[in-house]
Amino acid sequence: MPIIRKILARQILDSRGNPTVEVDVYTENSFGRAAVPSGASTGVHEAVELRDGDSAVYLGKGVLKAVDHVNTVINDRLKGMFVTDQEEIDMAMLALDGTPNKSRLGANALLGVSMACAKAGAEYSGLPLYRYIGGTMANTLPVPMMNVLNGGAHADNTVDFQEFMIMPVGFSSYSDALRSGAEIFHALKSLLKSKGLSTAVGDEGGFAPNLKSNEEAIELVIEAVGKAGYKIGSSTANGGLGDAQVMIALDPASSEFYDAAKQKYVFKKSSKQELSSLEMAEYWEKWASDYPIISIEDGMAEDDWDGWKILTDKIGSRVQLVGDDLFVTNTSRLALGIERGVGNSILVKVNQIGTLTETLQAIDLARRNGYTAVISHRSGETEDSTIAQIAVATNAGQIKTGSLSRSDRMAKYNELLRIEEELGLQAKYPALSAFRV
């Protein structure tokens, strides 16, 4: 019987050496384990990640309170339930927490249990997790957003924007796309060395050199694509997709350099330039005209709705505009964005909302309204590869899970290789069809 017998949580360490929650779920004849990720640049509207706050232990970042909630109240409530009743399990935990932002039990407690239950349910059913969640039509491998150059909150350097990414859009298989990313990563490393620049990496495995400007960062990435022997696209303003093998994606994480008091975007790490919302939107419009950019995530701050609308009206027909801090994987925030006509894509981070059911609901709402969904990691990760399974389960078509270094990032890429191998001829790589621009 798939009845939950025991739920056991523990405190482990993530890729930044900070505590996080790991959960084991036991039934009579199945088992599931999940570890919870954590972000560095977090949106103010995210569900609450419960930390202990004791500065003498792990600098206040311990998660023993969340662990205790799993081992006591959540365990007591879910014991005896069928592990295969995912929605009922998640709804029971939401009722138990009773707050709109999971602040009582902690989203990190709820998510660990939710994902571990799904894994135990999949094992009981004799199915891989992607098939258990997504059914027989789950067969689309995602186009990766590979974060090869870091700045912003993810690196101690002079670059304001958080992530400069490559997207292999001109390939017929995931494995070939991944190979191109790895080769471009190594070409970029060689290029940086030749210029006397640092090849130290940031939280997500991308390089984090000190550069003269934000423009130099994107130009280095473009140069590395060519150095690796791949064809970079041109600006989408000039119909630049064509036979492109690689396009550029950005995550400036604009909330991180938005000064709410001044209502200005301040380039604190580089030029000290201050831009209004209109000027920031015009900045991205120029970049989208000058460079082969196919996607911009969080191009405006999380509560700058007017700025988001300006940006969407300017370039939303030709560039994927992804809401991360804007939508925080929350159906209410996403519904508001749809109503206001801002963005055209949602970044999906399971720990922003706290349960698998709510995550799937957000993806469904996006899809029904013509928005794409990008399944995403966090900067603080573990060896857990659940998001790779979710990407295939939902046929999302895109995944964002870091650079081509650090085993916490490679765990997801390698899991997708295994899934592609398992699917065989059924496996689909969407390439440019993953985008709706």
Curated annotation (Swiss-Prot):
The active site is at E204 (proton donor), K349 (proton acceptor). Its EC number is 4.2.1.11. (2R)-2-phosphoglycerate binds at Q162, K349, R378, S379, K400. Pathway: Carbohydrate degradation; glycolysis; pyruvate from D-glyceraldehyde 3-phosphate: step 4/5. It is found in: Cytoplasm; Secreted; Cell surface. InterPro entries: Enolase, Enolase-like_C_sf, Enolase-like_N, Enolase_C, Enolase_CS, Enolase_N. GO terms for cellular component: cell surface; extracellular region; phosphopyruvate hydratase complex. It comes from the Bacteria. Its cofactor is Mg(2+). Keywords: Cytoplasm, Glycolysis, Lyase, Magnesium, Metal-binding, Secreted. It holds the Pfam family Enolase_N. It catalyses: (2R)-2-phosphoglycerate = phosphoenolpyruvate + H2O. Binds a second Mg(2+) ion via substrate during catalysis. GO terms for molecular function: magnesium ion binding; phosphopyruvate hydratase activity. GO terms for biological process: glycolytic process. SUPFAM superfamilies: Enolase C-terminal domain-like, Enolase N-terminal domain-like. The keyword Protease does not apply. It is an enzyme of class 4 (lyase). Belongs to the enolase family. Catalyzes the reversible conversion of 2-phosphoglycerate (2-PG) into phosphoenolpyruvate (PEP). It is essential for the degradation of carbohydrates via glycolysis. This is Enolase.
